[in-house]
Every structure is written in C-alpha cells, then in structure tokens.
C-alpha cells in the first residue's frame, strides 16, 4: 500500500486556483482517484496498488495541474506495510 500526503499553502492556493480552495482539494481528490487513491483523512490518500509507476504517475498528474506546484508547501509519498484502523475501538 502506498500513501500520498500533502500540505497546501492556503493563501497561495486561493490566489492560484481559479475557483478557490475547496475546488482545489476537489481537483486533487479527482486526480488521485484516477490512480486508485482513496482519501483517508485530511490530505492523506492511500492506494492498494503496489506498483511504484502508478505512484509516480499520480504525482506527475498533480504536478501537471497548473496551480498545484505554486500552491503546495510539501508533498510526500510513502509505503505502508501495516494498516490498523482503531476508529471503532475508540468510538465504542
């Protein structure tokens, strides 16, 4: 499983994206879904596909968004070997 995590500079995104911050996040989600990524929380997306070429393609697609490079503060990708969801334990 791979993950992509990013942080946008809100002021830069508001200035660079023609439709604003909410649409910027929607565009990112749409772009990453094309490569099998699912939003887990905030700006963290994961993908079950173990092909690193898919990961690189997703990042390149984000880079191709005209407003993204000038709006992103940080973007990281990493492999998740084990994933445990403790939500139901905490909520019970």
Swiss-Prot record:
Subunit-structure text: Homodimer.
**Whose protein is this, by species?**
Neisseria gonorrhoeae
Task: Name any one GO molecular function.
Answer: nuclease activity
Q: Which superkingdom?
A: Bacteria
Q: Does the keyword RNA-binding apply?
A: no
Q: What function does this protein fulfil?
A: Cleaves ssRNA, mostly between U:A.
Annotated InterPro entries = VapD, Virulence_VapD/CRISPR_Cas2
Enzyme class of the recorded protein, top EC level: hydrolase
- EC code: 3.1.-.-
| Record-stated family | Belongs to the VapD ribonuclease family.
Could you tell me what this protein is called? Endoribonuclease VapD homolog
């Amino acid at each position: 499983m791979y993950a992509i995590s990013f942080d946008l500079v809100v002021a830069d995104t508001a200035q660079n994206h023609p439709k604003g911050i909410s649409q910027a996040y929607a565009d990112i989600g749409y772009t990453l879904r094309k490569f099998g990524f699912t939003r887990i929380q905030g700006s963290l997306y994961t993908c079950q596909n173990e092909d690193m070429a898919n990961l690189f393609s997703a990042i390149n697609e984000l880079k191709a968004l005209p407003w993204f490079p000038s709006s992103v503060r940080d973007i990281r990708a990493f492999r998740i070997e084990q994933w445990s969801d403790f939500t139901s334990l905490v909520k019970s």
